[in-house]
């Protein structure tokens, strides 16, 4: 495990001092994707129809062969705030890969950064040797070298990709993007937006924390973060410190007034894909409209009902797709409703074409949060609490300060000493996860599989069958989930607050008899956290 300098000590000291170029891929940069020759081929006609509904704020790549280059670039969060970012293809987020269900895709990763990198396909059940985990499924890709990922995309939905090499720092610097697998029988919408949410630090003196091995890297900044100067954070929990460290919230690499609006027309059916690439949960509110949550982590909700004036809490690593009909003309703000200092900077305008009305947002901070375990219509799922399981496993998730540094444990151990979950191919597996941390939230992510959530705090799930790959567990909560061991390999099972993962909250699902198809390269500093 990586050695860390105690975060409270670093924060106290620091804050006191602080007074896609492949011929088989189609590029659709910016907002203008309508200049394709619709008469050339049937494929181009399909792309033209798709471009009418997509309104991306980043490059969208289609096809089945892609090139992603990891490199350093400057990111303008707004007119006054510039960051040195690590990127795929020079942007944060990186390009969206838009692919069709059933296709085999190939992604060439070129590394132009000074450190090794990988790509992990978050949520996609890829073969084990394509999962992008340094030292577990491959060696990290060294500077000036390349690696080719190739796999079939069978499960439609909203996913994202990010580096899993020293992810606590590399993802924090911007090394991520989105991937959408379109179903064969996709129900059409008029507009299809993707919003990738993240947080950034203001104080560039915290960059020292990165080189010192802190759990949360810093970014360069353009202004002084003096409001938190002289603040003593010693004794604070991770949950208390994080919002004070990350005070700039972003959507698609922009913050505040620089966030580009989502343009709609009255009567249009609109889908918004929300992806949380950051460390903090985001409670998002869509004012003035009823909406349905059609999927979570890419997996459909059964008969989702319309809801209004409820907050959608999106934890790190989670994805939610929502749909609404644009039937209330004006200019609205899809905004964050948390008490975090950075919340005010995350408000995405939804603007009706041709309307000049003033921006509208709800000032109420007391709106209820959607309970996704009670949302949607109940139906028979793949698993139940009454099934017979081949393997049962308990994960006690906790925070430990007993050795003078904050660590995050599974069953009292930190990775790589956490006990693995040993399975055989075909096993039915039931896992109980309990968050015993007094204040810290743990969004637990399983690689290579989806799991079905069976119960929460001892009560069976009452809404739609809930299938996820990332589950947000609040302090004191207990969940039981189940999955089938149907994808042989060695798979990470970890907290997607990557600071918690880097400080120990990781384990592995290990298949009996499986042997990786690579040899550890001793010249590569593989860092799977």
Where are these regions (language model features)?
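Positively charged n-region of N-terminal signal peptides that target proteins for export
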Residues: 1-5, 10
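C-terminal motif of bacterial Sec signal peptides marking the signal peptidase cleavage site
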Residues: 16-19
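Extended terminal and domain-junction accessory segments
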Residues: 21-67, 171, 176-208, 213, ...
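Histidine- and aromatic-enriched segments that form or immediately flank copper-ligand environments
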Residues: 28, 69-182, 281-312, 332-344, ...
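Structural beta-strand segments of beta-rich domains
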Residues: 64, 103-107, 268-272, 427-429
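Histidine- and aromatic-rich segments of cupredoxin/plastocyanin-like copper-binding domains
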Residues: 130-133, 139-142, 152, 232-370, ...
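Acidic-aromatic/histidine active-site loop/patch
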Residues: 194-266, 275, 398-400, 408-413
């Amino acid at each position: 495990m990586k050695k860390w300098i105690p975060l409270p000590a670093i924060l106290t000291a620091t804050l006191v001092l602080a007074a896609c170029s492949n011929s088989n891929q189609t590029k659709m940069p910016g907002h203008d994707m309508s200049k394709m020759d619709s008469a050339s081929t049937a494929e181009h006609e399909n792309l033209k129809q798709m471009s009418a509904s997509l309104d991306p704020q980043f490059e969208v790549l289609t096809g089945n062969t892609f090139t992603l280059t990891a490199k350093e670039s400057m990111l303008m969060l707004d007119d006054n705030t510039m960051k040195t970012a690590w990127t795929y293809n020079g942007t944060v987020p990186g390009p969206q890969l838009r692919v069709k269900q059933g296709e085999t895709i190939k992604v060439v990763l070129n590394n132009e950064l000074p450190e090794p990198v990988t790509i992990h396909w978050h949520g996609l059940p890829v073969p084990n040797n394509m999962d992008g985990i340094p030292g577990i499924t491959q060696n990290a890709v060294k500077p000036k070298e390349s690696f080719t990922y190739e796999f079939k995309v069978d499960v439609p939905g909203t996913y994202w990709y990010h580096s899993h090499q020293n992810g606590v720092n590399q993802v924090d610097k911007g090394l991520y993007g989105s991937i959408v697998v379109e179903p064969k029988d996709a129900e059409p919408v008029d507009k299809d937006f993707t919003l990738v949410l993240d947080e950034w630090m203001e104080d560039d003196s915290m960059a020292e924390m990165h080189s010192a091995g802190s759990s949360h890297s810093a970014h360069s900044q353009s202004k002084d973060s003096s409001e938190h100067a002289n603040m003593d954070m010693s004794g604070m929990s991770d949950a208390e410190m994080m919002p004070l460290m990350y005070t700039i919230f972003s959507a698609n690499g922009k913050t505040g007034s620089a966030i580009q609006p989502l343009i709609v027309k009255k009567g249009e059916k609109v889908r918004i894909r929300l992806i949380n690439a950051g460390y903090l949960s985001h409670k998002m509110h869509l004012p003035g409209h009823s909406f349905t949550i059609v999927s979570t982590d890419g997996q459909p909700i059964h008969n989702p009902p319309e809801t209004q004036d409820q907050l959608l809490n999106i934890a790190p690593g989670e994805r939610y797709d929502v749909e609404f009909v644009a039937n209330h003309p004006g200019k609205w703000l899809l905004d964050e409703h948390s008490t975090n200092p950075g919340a005010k900077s995350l408000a995405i305008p939804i603007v009706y074409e041709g309307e000049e009305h003033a921006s509208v947002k709800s000032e109420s901070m007391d709106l209820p949060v959607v309970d996704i375990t009670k949302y949607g219509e109940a139906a028979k799922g793949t698993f139940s609490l009454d099934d017979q399981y081949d393997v049962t496993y308990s994960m006690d998730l906790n925070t430990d300060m007993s050795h003078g540094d904050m660590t995050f444990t599974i069953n009292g151990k930190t990775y790589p000493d956490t006990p693995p979950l040993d399975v055989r191919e075909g096993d039915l597996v039931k896992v109980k996860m309990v968050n015993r941390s007094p204040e810290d939230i743990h969004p637990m992510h399983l690689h290579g599989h989806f799991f079905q959530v069976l119960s929460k705090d001892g009560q069976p799930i009452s809404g739609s069958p809930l299938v996820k790959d990332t589950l947000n567990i609040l302090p004191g909560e207990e969940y039981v989930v189940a999955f089938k061991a149907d994808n042989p390999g060695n798979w990470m099972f970890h907290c997607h607050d990557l600071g918690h993962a880097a400080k120990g909250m990781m384990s592995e699902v290990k298949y009996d008899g499986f042997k990786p198809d690579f040899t550890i390269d001793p010249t590569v500093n593989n860092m799977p956290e």
